[in-house]
Regions:
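Short beta-turn/strand-loop junction motif enriched in small, turn-promoting residues
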Residues: 96-98, 116-117, 160
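A generic structural signal for short beta-strands and their flanking turns/coil linkers
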Residues: 87-89, 106-108, 127
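Short histidine-centered beta-strand/loop micro-motifs
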Residues: 101-102, 118-123, 164
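Short acidic-glycine-tyrosine-enriched beta hairpin
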Residues: 141-160
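Short peripheral tails and domain-boundary helices/loops at the edges of structured domains
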Residues: 178-189
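Ligand-binding loop in jelly-roll beta-barrel domains
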Residues: 157-180
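Short, conserved beta-strand element in jelly-roll/cupin
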Residues: 109-115, 122-138
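A short, N-terminal "cap"/entry segment at the start of jelly-roll beta-barrel domains
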Residues: 1-103
Length: 189
């Protein structure tokens, strides 16, 4: 998992929006989490993500380390449906319950399959999405825009937002900061 952590550090140092969002510190203690799988985790290594020059190194590191990650699900089938559960997964790279401990931020690697609707949801922690590969339509109550590799989207605390992947899967690096760091997102609709 160290290669992913190092590439995440580089991305946070090089991208102004991420750098301004938080101080990413790759020196957290390795918690040696047990690898776990979800129905979608094998799809990550099988997908040819459309990345950018900046994101291709971390994409390759993630794909090479799929079997070492502690993949998780946030929602139940009753909340988001079976298709979503089967085609979405994430692991916490850095944070209170991540592969590398940090109590000031959380950093997730998240995957969504193509043509997938991520319902309106919110959380107390502030958040910034950084797209590694693929593209998706992001929505808040005041904006709608398509993001692709090397682009970001910020969400304020408790700002309800939704996302739809398009004709290709999405891989994203997501950072959280502030209050509510220990909690997960909740479905709003």
């Amino acid at each position: 998992m160290y290669p992913i952590l190092q590439f995440a550090q580089t991305i946070c140092n090089d991208n102004l929006e991420l750098k301004n969002f938080c101080q990413f510190n790759a020196s957290g203690t390795n918690k040696n989490l047990e690898p776990t799988t979800t129905p979608a985790s094998s799809l990550v290594s099988e997908t040819a993500f459309k990345g950018s020059e900046e994101t291709l190194p971390i994409i390759e590191a993630i794909k090479k380390n799929v079997c070492k990650a502690n993949w998780r699900q946030t929602y139940s089938t009753s909340e988001v449906g079976e298709d979503f559960v089967n085609r979405h997964c994430y692991f916490e790279l850095i944070g209170p319950t991540g592969h590398f401990y940090n109590d000031a931020i959380r950093g997730f690697i998240c995957y969504w399959g193509e043509n997938l609707h991520y319902k309106w949801h919110s959380h107390e922690a502030e958040e910034i999405y950084y797209i590694l590969g693929g593209k998706a339509l992001f929505k808040t109550k005041t904006m709608t825009k398509v993001l692709k590799a090397n682009e970001t989207q910020f969400h304020k605390s408790w700002e309800s937002h939704a996302m739809e992947t398009l004709e290709e899967p999405l891989l994203a690096f997501i950072l959280w900061r502030g209050n509510g760091l220990e909690k997960l997102a909740q479905i709003d609709d």
